[in-house]
Amino acid sequence: MKFLELNKKRHATKQFTDKPVDPKDVRTAIEIATLAPSAHNSQPWKFVVVREKNVELAKLAYGSNFEQVSSAPVTIALFTDTDLAKRARKIARVGGANNFSEEQLQYFMKNLPAEFARYNEQQVSDYLALNAGLVAMNLVLALTDQGIGSNLILGFDKSKVNEVLEIEDRFRPELLITVGYTDEKLEPSYRLPVDEIIEKR
């Protein structure tokens, strides 16, 4: 599917049918999503595919988001790794000499952790939010490309997600992404004309 067509086809899917979503399709979409760029190639994301605990997770969603999560066959909880130094070292460890030169291994094992050590709390938060947004957009496009609907949800109680899903506290919940099929005819949302958002200097 051409990129323009793919973007025009993607809409927020808020009501789902009972049609199950194949776990292989979800895995494929996540694999494609991780081709997204990330600052320093740090890839600080973690995906939790929720099926069995969807009802419990839905209770943490605010307002109409409760219905969306409750009815979705699958919800993907997107987390980011707040221990950026550990994440950098993991990339070096998992990638190893087969994928990295000695210089690159040094970068992930020592240089990058030293860089992250200089970040204050706000810088870490901004860094994680940016990278989460990049991979989340790739994920919904990858799902759309397979004919699967999705919606990005920000309104939920982030303070309780780790406990409900049994995820280590070092991982920060960013988004819930509901996933499934719909029989609704979805219409595009209004977009500002491009000249309204461009300035030239």
Predicted regions span which residues?
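Acidic, surface-exposed loops and disordered segments
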Residues: M1-R201
